[in-house]
Each structure stands twice: as structure tokens, then as C-alpha cells.
UniProtKB/Swiss-Prot annotation:
It catalyses: dUMP + (6R)-5,10-methylene-5,6,7,8-tetrahydrofolate + NADPH + H(+) = dTMP + (6S)-5,6,7,8-tetrahydrofolate + NADP(+). Catalyzes the reductive methylation of 2'-deoxyuridine-5'-monophosphate (dUMP) to 2'-deoxythymidine-5'-monophosphate (dTMP) while utilizing 5,10-methylenetetrahydrofolate (mTHF) as the methyl donor, and NADPH and FADH(2) as the reductant. GO terms for molecular function: flavin adenine dinucleotide binding; NADPH binding; thymidylate synthase (FAD) activity; thymidylate synthase activity. It comes from Corynebacterium diphtheriae (strain ATCC 700971 / NCTC 13129 / Biotype gravis). CDD domains: ThyX (cd20175). Its cofactor is FAD. The gene is thyX. It is an enzyme of class 2 (transferase). This is Flavin-dependent thymidylate synthase.
Length: 252
């Protein structure tokens, strides 16, 4: 019986900052490590560690200023890594198009599960009849997958390497697995890349699944760098899903 998987995003790594020796600069106590790194990189460009401009002396004011003038390259220094579960293969295909990220994704060639875990689109999940049809179809595909695996195992019986035999069988049989099959993926990106991803995928024009992912990532990143992501505002759409937009993200 197919099992429903729900989106789960966890932060597993984020940049830390240590003031280098020999630099006479005091980190703003209100700044997070990632935000301190952004400011340090900017001040290193112009040797303004003495904070000559009172309007940008505070970390939050400094970061807002560089965003207003479009100096987004400074946001490429801090990075964040998340581990995502409960995301469909079709959604990961959209995710990996963001080439400034680094990815490590669950392999269907090496990992075999006795159960099928799927992500059900809300439009289907909210309708009992459609949900039943969806899950029964997934079960039929899973049965066909198991039959193919058995047949391929028999076909490859002369292969002495059991690991290779199973891998070859899986890589052939997996072609019939549904796009809704759950995947798991580690994603690392700098803050500029994360902002671009959120700007592109948290809009009302994006698919609801990847939009949910983008909004969840925004919530997580706001905790680590509130000023860097504070320009994004969320709102609720007519279908109850959440979107986010920023006046600084215009290249849709």
C-alpha cells in the first residue's frame, strides 16, 4: 500500500564567522554569523572597518543598503545547507534546475524500498475519490515494478556480482515509477542563490509543491539571517497556499 510523504526541510549547516586577527572591527551584537560575514566582506572591499558612515554603522542598516544598491555579490559568502524529505521526483527535477546550488540526491539505483512513498498533490489529496484513484494507481505501478524486478533478476541470473545485478535491475525497472515518488536531497547554496530560488519559486505562478518548499526554506533562512531575507513578504492565496515576494527580486 502506497504511503503518503509530507514535506520536511531541516537546516543541517550554516556559515559561522570569526573576526580575523589584526582587523580592528567590532561585530554588531545584533548580527547573526551569516550577517556579520556579509558586512565584513563588504567592508573589506573598501577598508571601512571604522564605520565612517553612521547611516550604515549598524549591521541591519548596512545589509539593507547593499541590497538597495544591488551589491548582491556580498550575499554569496554565507551558505546554508538543508536536508529535504517528502519532495516528489518531479519537484526535484525543478529544483535541480537552479544550477548555483549543490545537490546530493537519493539514488533509485542503489536504494530499494519495500514500500512506495509518494507525494500527493493538494488538488488530489483534498478529494477523497481522486485520492483513492491516485493511491490505487500508484499501487498498480508498484506491483508492475516488483514484477519487473523479479523478471530482471531472473534475466540477469548469470551475473555473479549480486550488487551489480540488483543495480542493473533497479535502473531498468525504475523507469516506470511515478513522478510522485518521494525523493530525498541535500541542497547547499549561498544566500544569493537561495534568494533567487525563493524569488522564482515562491510566487503564485510556481507549482504548489515547489512553492511550499521555497516558503519553508525562507522561514528557515529568516531565522539564520533575518535582515538578509526580511524583504520577502508572505501572503495567502485563494487556495490556502502561501506565496512570498520581494521588491528586490525582479528577474522572474
Amino acid at each position: 500500500m502506497a504511503q503518503q510523504s509530507l514535506l520536511d526541510v531541516q537546516l543541517v549547516a550554516c556559515s559561522t564567522f570569526t573576526t580575523p586577527s589584526g582587523v580592528d572591527w567590532k561585530v554588531d551584537s545584533a548580527a547573526t554569523d551569516s550577517e556579520a560575514l556579509v558586512e565584513f566582506a563588504g567592508r573589506a572591499c573598501y577598508e571601512t572597518f571604522d564605520k565612517p558612515n553612521p547611516r550604515t554603522a549598524a549591521n541591519d542598516a548596512y545589509i539593507r543598503h547593499i541590497m538597495e544598491v544591488g551589491h548582491m555579490a556580498l550575499l554569496e559568502h554565507p551558505t546554508a545547507t538543508v536536508y529535504i524529505r517528502g519532495l516528489s521526483r518531479s519537484a526535484t527535477h525543478e529544483l535541480v534546475r537552479h544550477r548555483h546550488f549543490s545537490f546530493s540526491q537519493l539514488s533509485q539505483r542503489f536504494v530499494h524500498s519495500d514500500e512506495t512513498h509518494v507525494v500527493i498533490p493538494p488538488l488530489i489529496d483534498n478529494d477523497p475519490q481522486l485520492r483513492e484513484l491516485f493511491l490505487s494507481t500508484v499501487d498498480e505501478v508498484r506491483f508492475a515494478y516488483s514484477e519487473l524486478m523479479t523478471a530482471l533478476d531472473n534475466k540477469l541470473a548469470d551475473e555473479p556480482n549480486a550488487i551489480l545485478r540488483r543495480k542493473q535491475a533497479r535502473q531498468a525497472a525504475r523507469s516506470i515509477l511515478p513522478n510522485a515518488t518521494e525523493s530525498r536531497i541535500v541542497v547547499t547554496g549561498n544566500f544569493r542563490a537561495w534568494r533567487h530560488f525563493i524569488g522564482m519559486r515562491a510566487t503564485e505562478h510556481a507549482d504548489v509543491e515547489i512553492r511550499s518548499l521555497a516558503v519553508r526554506c525562507l522561514e528557515i533562512l529568516k531565522e539564520k539571517a533575518p535582515t538578509v531575507f526580511s524583504d520577502f513578504e508572505t501572503s495567502v492565496l485563494s487556495d490556502g497556499s502561501i506565496m512570498a515576494t520581494s521588491p528586490y527580486v525582479t528577474d522572474y
